[in-house]
Amino acid sequence: MVYLRHHRRDKEDSRERAVNRSYITGVKLTSEHMVDVMRAISKRVGVQIIDYSVYPDTESEPWRMKVFIEFDGEISDRYDLAAIFDEELSRVNEEHGHMLRIGETSPSVVYVLHRNASKELREENAKKKISDNQVKVIRYINSQSLLRDYMKRVKKAYGEGA
């Protein structure tokens, strides 16, 4: 289970904030929630998803999710991926929809990554001499440096403030 929290240098502050943030937002996501959401998005837009990652943007008030998706093809401009993501996540996790309705969570932002972005990120991690068992798909972005690495690979953004 992924508890949405903000990564901080001070470990005690981080733990306290993580516990408080998860109760404040009420949104606890499982990997199953995200797999269901990604399948639904893929079906709605008619393009397969290669990979995805999420970042809980707690610097935004109220907090929001930044979602990075790599598709196996082009997405039509008629789709608002941010709205689709929030609709589908609200369907599988009612708390997300509730928090959106009462203003405790801002609408999500979805970033479409350029082709092969996920592969590039894994290769960069391998070059950093991370052990082989740690070079894996990153589902939860937990640092500003990793967020910057993802932002460098954005092809298009959807959502308010994107």
Task: Indicate where each model-derived feature is located.
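AMP-binding adenylation
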Residues: M1-A162
